[in-house]
Amino acid sequence: MRTFNYSAIREQKWDSDVLGLIAAIYKEAGKQELYLKQRPEELEKLVEIAKIQSTEASNAIEGIVTTSTRIRQLVEEKTTPRNRDEQEIAGYRDVLSIIHESFDVIPITQNYILQLHKNLYSHMNNPLAGRTKSVQNYITATYPDGHVETLFTPLAPYETPEALDRICEEYNRVIGNMELEPLIAIPVFIHDFLCIHPFNDGNGRMSRLLTTLLLYRSGFYVGKYISLEAKIAKNKDLYYDALAQAQTGWHEGNEDVVPFIKYLLGTILAAGKDFEDRVALVETKLSALEMVRRASKNRIGRFNKQDIRELCPSLSLSSIEGSLRKLVENDELKREGAGKSTVYLRLK
């Protein structure tokens, strides 16, 4: 069976990319702490928006979808689930809320992970909720011609409970003893979790919820204000590529987890940069036009209305579209393409 020794990671020599990402994340975290002290009320506006985006994106990655209106109503608990997808979305909302409110009293143990998994399915009858997998699972790819290829075989069901215990013990030990930088330990833990693939269903969503939990417990709160899940969903091909690279040789213990570490740290840093941009937009009461104007000035090269929506999540899509039209009419932006392929370029 695969063994785990997180202390050995200390011996690894990290390249300048990894070290640079870690330094930049700490710098952004310092700025975020300052904003939180100075403008807590304004930042609260970002929390609910991030919850909605996180719930929508993390489920969409797994093909679990409903309309944007229904997502908002479900996250705000103004409606009840109508179908299986909405039941799963409501479960994700519940677990995310638990993590937001109680992260400091949720230990990283198998029992608590199983409880969170059970809560993920609390709106439906799933006899496997809160239990490790009962059958062997596989990570596969389906190609355009219809053939399916196995990319990775996770641990067998009988090996799973012990492995889940071991990664929790190793993580808690190196964090508790301050042996390992949390921004290294967190991606390593999440990568091992995904390679174990402990559940029959819900592994991807649980991995993203655990990422948020581990970051909060280590003092990195950017995911509360900027959706990490939305960042992953936007670049999910890069996410799967990094994961596939890092899984090679995992069973033998000679994997190279650096691609996954870089991917996750890059995502956290990108969220930190977005936090700065978004704070600048909520600091003062601006018109929709001025918000979109300022957001467009944060973009380099071509961008679309979805890019602006990420920076101005408090605006409706119709407000963003109307503002973009006015900026084009004012010769501040140039529009290219049509329909879904419409993009914009700054002229000023």
Q: How should each PLM-predicted stretch be described?
A:
Residues 1-348:
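FIC/Doc superfamily catalytic core
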